Amino acid sequence: YAKEIQTPYYGEGLDGLLSARWQSLWGIVNGIDYEVWNPATDPQVYKNYSVDNFRQLKKINKIELQKECGLPQDENQFVIGIISRLTDQKGLDLVDRIMNDICCDGVQFIVLGTGDGKYENMFKYYQGIHPAKVSANIYYSDERSHKMYAGCDVMLVPSRFEPCGLTQLMALRYGTVPVVRETGGLADTVEAYNQFEG
C-alpha cells in the first residue's frame, strides 16, 4: 500500500509528495487480537476447533451456519462468504458480474454487511432468484461474523483498494481461505497463488 499511494491512481493528489519522501514512508500492517479471534476458544462459534481437528469440526460449523442462514445443509457445498461494508471501494461490482456463475451446483454464497442501497438490493435480488444458493444478511452482527469465519470455505475480498484490511487476517486465523484482489494491504498479507509452487 505504501508503494501504491506513490502513484497518481492511489495517491489522491499526494503522490508527488509521497514519492519525493519515499524513504520516510513506511507501511504498518494491521493485526488482530488472537485471544478474541481464536477458533479454539471463541464462544461465538458453533463448535471450537484447532489446527489438530479443524478438518472434522469446521464441517460442523459449516452445517450450522447453513442452517442459521436458511440454506440447505450439505458439508460438500463450497461456501463463499463476504463480510464487508457494501460500497464501491469493496469491489462488489466485480462480484455482480459473476454472481450467476457463482450460484452454480455445489456452491453457496453468504454475505454479511450494510452499505450502499444498490449493493444491498443486489444481494437481496440474488437471494430472491437463488434462494438455495444465496443468503443476504443485510446487517452487521459480530456473532454472525465469527460464525462465518468458522463455517465458510472461502472469504472473498475483492476490494478495489485496501490500505490493509482485517477480513483476510481473521479468515486465515479460522482456516478459511481468503480470496483477495491483489492490492494494498491485501497483497501485503495474503501470499499470491502460484500455479507452479502451490
Where are the predicted features?
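Catalytic cores of nucleotide-sugar-dependent glycosyltransferases that transfer UDP/GDP/TDP-activated
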Residues: 1-198
